[in-house]
């Protein structure tokens, strides 16, 4: 997780780093729980709402960090946690 955030220019010294890291980890775990209830749905469809929530977290920090590409971040994280996203 740390390497993804740093690759986006979000460093531990930023106020809110821990909050964003926690929010993303929590949403990724929630996606896994959702997938258990809806096993026929691809992760890419289930994570739409999760993407929106995480984007809101980044928007709150947009004045201190560069605007990241949330789709690529989530795709990488989901693939790391669960394998192929489709």
Indicate residue ranges for each PLM-predicted region.
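Helix-loop elements that line ligand-binding/catalytic pockets
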Residues: 9
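Basic, alpha-helical nucleic-acid-binding regions used in initiation and control of genome expression
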Residues: 1-6, 14-18, 22-24, 29-86
């Amino acid at each position: 997780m740390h390497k993804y955030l740093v690759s986006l220019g979000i460093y531990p010294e930023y106020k809110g780093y821990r909050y964003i890291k926690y929010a993303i980890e929590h949403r990724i775990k929630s996606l896994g729980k959702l997938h258990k209830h809806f096993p026929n749905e691809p992760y890419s469809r289930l994570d739409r709402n999760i993407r929106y929530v995480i984007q809101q977290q980044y928007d709150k920090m947009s004045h201190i960090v560069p605007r990241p590409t949330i789709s690529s971040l989530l795709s990488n994280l989901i693939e790391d946690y669960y394998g192929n996203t489709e």
